Amino acid sequence: MLKFKKTDTMHVNIRRFCLALVACLCMSGSVSAIVRNPMIWADVPDPDVIRVGEYYYMVTTTMHLMPGAPIMRSKDFSNWETIGYLFDRLTDSPKYDMEDGTVYGRGQWATSLRYHKGTFYALFAPNDNLGGDTYIMTAKDAAGPWKIHSRLRHFHDASLFFDDDDRVYVIYGTGEMCELTSDLQGVVPGSECRIFQREADETGLLEGSRFIKHDGKYYLLMISHVWAPGRYRRQVCYRADDIKGPYEKKVILQSDFGGFPHVGQGTIVDGNDGKWYGVIFQDRGGVGRVLTYMPCRWIDGWPILGDEQGRVPDTMPQGGDEVRSTHLVTSDDFSNDKLSLYWQWNHNPIDEAWSLTERPGFLRLKTNKIVSNVYAARNTISQRMEGPRCSASVTLDLRHMVDGDRCGLAAFNGHSGLLTIVRDGKSYKLVQSNTLVHLTDREKAITGVDEDVVEQVDLKRCKKIQLRIDGDFTPGKDIATFYYKIGKGEWTPIGEPFKMQFDYRRLFMGTRYAIFNYATKQAGGYVDVDSFDYSREE
């Protein structure tokens, strides 16, 4: 629950009048709606965006979460909704089931999204095995169902490209390219080549390929990490008259934004209005990698990003006429018999260990494997957290927990802040703790979890409880605070403010709201989640 400053009646009435006036002007066409950056103040990294008709479609990275590779849709760059996923689960490795390791921070990365002659295409390479496959998936509707069209060798951060003559290419790595067979089932022999050589100032990573053709020229957009003093990121573009080169390079964006380091990695897209736009992400602390939206101006044949000063603007005109307000994170009363698209599981779920139908109106989470910590638990379910401030609470029915069970709500990441209900014999206690997971570099196997218990409260024979976590992602904060409520009482703070962090060495994503339930002694218990109530300060 978010709290805002109270104001007197006169100020409230003035504010209501102003809002009504703006609404009327907007409906009459006198005022253009705006998009405030970050366009999406949540973890939505590695975007690829295309336009098909009146809609913009976007795919992003969700790594170890299932279902994976969310497909989002918008008419205006402001109101985005998740309409589907490329896959429900990945099964190439037992690590997706948390066997022989995990895929924390790996899994699905940097997907390329395309539309060609009535078919949507998506290409991605799971990053859990660098010698593994690249998937090409197809669908007639971006919402799905998607099916595997072919599997190729590994292409890192690749872009799929259909040329005007219907020849198909994959541009990947650091300026590498190959042609695919016309059926997209393999690589044309002898077609592999490098289309440019890294320059001396490119001292760090050069990746995140996005390839387009405009006015007869070929353009490759990439992120450039420069490890020189100052360590900065920028968006660069390589341009050529022939797809195989020679290519020339230009820096098209080098800008920080909102008190955070430089913006880099994303794509450009042509708008419904004939203009071009850039969608580029930015590392923004504990909330993760957020999306910024900016003009793309063609100057001397180069796609120059940012405003007239080359910077990410604070606001942008809304790029369309969407009349609905849509969201990427929302409340859920679990009244449907199918799980909402807002939710993602941590790794592949155990389907028989959860239900929306055994007790209608509740999400039932059953214990399964016996584990010692939340990072090893199966069937943890999550949604993103959002800036600038957000709040989420869950209502839990605890009556069917058994000795040793642990359930609760987390600000979940490699560093997590937890509200945990512990069943100990016949009693219950509420624990606010902070955890840090340790993972092996190669297999991402869990080698240990550090836990700092900040505060615990004896709940005696509690049957039902509400848990709440507030997130503050305003610059310089990244703070989670914790509360609980029993019955019709007031919200009671517990523990201490927790500093949320983004750590690429661990989960490599933004902090998420996560609901968990696991057994430490014996399987067979379960909790019923009555509701998930979410709010965000716009």
Where are these regions (language model features)?
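Bacterial N-terminal signal peptides
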Residues: 18-29
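Bacterial N-terminal signal peptides that target proteins for export
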Residues: 2-19
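Carbohydrate-active catalytic/glycan-binding domains of CAZyme proteins
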Residues: 32-538
